[in-house]
Amino acid sequence: MNLKDQIENPTRNKIIKELHKSPMKFIAVITGAGTTAISDIMSLPGSSKTVIEVLIPYSKESLEFFNSSPLNKHVSVIESKNMASSIYIKGKSYLDKNEKFIGIGCTAAISTIPQRKGEDRAHISICNGDIIKSVTINLSRKNRSRLEQERIVSDLIINLLAESFDIDLRMNLDLYDDEKIIIHN
């Protein structure tokens, strides 16, 4: 997929327009990758009906706020769950009790210099108060640039928002054979 197609994806724009029509809203904490999803959502009219708040902590110290105790490993499913539930609780503290919203936590490690040990990946969790759904995407280091990895993580966030908002549209992520999405219970 070329860069122009990545930016001007008509399905993405349709999903975002549907998100903006929904009575649901979201509050998010995103680190490492996935912030392009927020840019995409806010680039179309209606985002004030959808977005409550977005935080982008980037240092380990700022991420500790979302974890009840220091983690041995950042960029993990546990961290994304902690982020989603913490930001959901924060939203509950100041929103009307009848407000319908979800909390999103995304933590990612994508292509960098120098190359890190371990896989390029993202963990995304969505909390609606009762349930936390989490997914992991393992990304291709050899086939994707950092920009392409950011795009894939962002599109996955938008797809998960669509699912959470009961919108039937999804983008095809065009994953390579060495990439996979894992759904956690």
Indicate residue ranges for each PLM-predicted region:
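Flexible inter-domain linker/hinge segments
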Residues: 171-185
